[in-house]
Regions:
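A general structural signal for well-ordered alpha-helical segments in protein cores
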Residues: 12, 31, 58-59, 71, ...
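Conserved AdoMet
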Residues: 35-107
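Short glycine/threonine-rich catalytic loop with a Thr-x-Gly-x-Asp
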Residues: 94, 123, 220
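Conserved Class I SAM-dependent methyltransferase catalytic core
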Residues: 218-267
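Generic alpha-helical structural context detector
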Residues: 32-36, 63, 103, 129, ...
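A short N-terminal interaction module
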Residues: 2-54, 58
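Mobile active-site "lid"/loop adjacent to the S-adenosyl-L-methionine
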Residues: 193-223
Length: 267
C-alpha cells in the first residue's frame, strides 16, 4: 500500500509490484505514469517523501489500474500522432494502429484541392483528426452516435485553429440518407469489428471500453456491409474508402463495388 512518507522510488516500486501481480501489461510504464498523475514529475528525479494527499491519490489510482481500468481513462488524455486527445469512460481509447490508417488515408488525397472527408464511428475523433493533421486542407466531418463518446469528440474537435473538424451526432445506419451524391473525396472509419465470440475473450482493459464501439454481430462485418452498401454513392468518381479492420481479407471480400488499392498489415 502507498502511504505518506514513502520515498518516490519506493512508492513506484510498490505500485509496479501491485500492477504486475494484477496482470497489468507494461506495469513499469503504468507505475511511472500513475506517479506523474498523482504527484507530478518523474519519480527518478524526485527525493521528497510523499505527502498524505499525494499518497492517497497514488493509492486510489493504483487500485483503479489494478482493477484493469484502462490507463488512458485514468490519465484523461492520450497522445495520438503529435497531439493530445481527451479520453475517458464511454469512448474507445486511441491506438497506434489508427495512426497508420490516418497517414495512409491522407495519402489518398494527394493532388485533391480542399478534399471533403467523412469519418464514420468517430469516437474521440482520432482518425479524422489524423487525416487533417497529414492533410491540413481537408474539410473533415466526424460522425458519432454514442452520447458519451460524442462529448469527447466535441472536446477534441477544435484542438487548434489548424487542427479542426466538424463533429456530428448521428447513426451510421441512417446518416447516409442525408448525404448528396458524389460530393466526398474520402470516407474513413474505424468501425466496430469484433465478432460475438471475440467479445467474450477480451483483454480486461478492452472489456471496460464501450461494447458499442467494439461489437459488430456474429461475423464482425455488420458495419462494413452498411458502409459498402450505403455510402458508395456519396463518393465522387475515383473517391476512396479507408477502413480499419482486424479481419482484413474477410472484410475486403465483402466490399462489393470497390477496388482494393492498399492493404496495411501491422504485426
Amino acid at each position: 500500500m502507498v502511504t505518506a512518507g514513502m520515498l518516490p522510488r519506493a512508492a513506484v516500486r510498490e505500485v509496479e509490484a501491485r500492477l504486475r501481480a494484477a496482470g497489468c501489461p507494461d506495469a513499469d510504464f503504468d507505475a511511472a505514469e500513475l506517479f506523474r498523475l498523482a504527484v507530478g514529475g518523474d519519480a527518478r528525479l524526485a527525493d521528497a517523501p510523499l505527502g498524505a494527499e499525494q499518497a492517497e491519490r497514488l493509492e486510489a489510482l493504483t487500485a483503479r489500474r489494478a482493477a484493469r481500468e484502462p490507463l488512458q481513462y485514468l490519465c484523461g488524455s492520450w497522445p495520438f500522432l503529435d497531439f493530445e486527445l481527451a479520453v475517458g469512460p464511454g469512448v474507445l481509447c486511441p491506438r497506434a494502429d489508427t495512426e497508420v490508417v490516418a497517414e495512409a488515408a491522407a495519402g489518398m488525397l494527394a493532388g485533391v484541392e480542399a478534399p471533403r472527408v467523412l469519418d464514420l464511428c468517430a469516437g474521440t475523433g482520432c482518425l479524422g483528426l489524423g487525416v487533417k493533421r497529414f492533410c491540413p486542407a481537408a474539410q473533415v466531418t466526424s460522425l458519432e452516435k454514442s452520447p458519451a463518446a460524442y462529448r469527447y469528440l466535441e472536446q477534441n474537435a477544435h484542438l487548434s485553429p489548424v487542427l479542426t473538424i466538424t463533429p456530428v451526432q448521428g447513426d451510421l445506419f441512417t446518416y447516409w440518407q442525408t448525404l448528396p451524391e458524389g460530393q466526398l473525396d474520402l470516407i474513413v472509419s474505424n468501425p466496430p469489428y469484433l465478432t460475438a465470440a471475440e467479445m467474450g475473450a477480451l483483454q480486461p482493459e478492452v472489456a471496460q471500453e464501450p461494447a458499442m464501439a467494439l461489437e459488430a454481430g456474429e461475423d464482425g462485418l455488420v458495419f462494413y456491409r452498411a458502409i459498402a452498401e450505403h455510402y458508395q454513392k456519396a463518393l465522387r468518381p475515383g473517391g476512396a474508402l479507408a477502413l480499419e479492420s482486424c479481419n482484413g481479407p474477410a472484410c475486403c471480400q465483402r466490399v462489393d463495388g470497390y477496388r482494393v488499392q492498399k492493404r496495411l498489415w501491422r504485426q
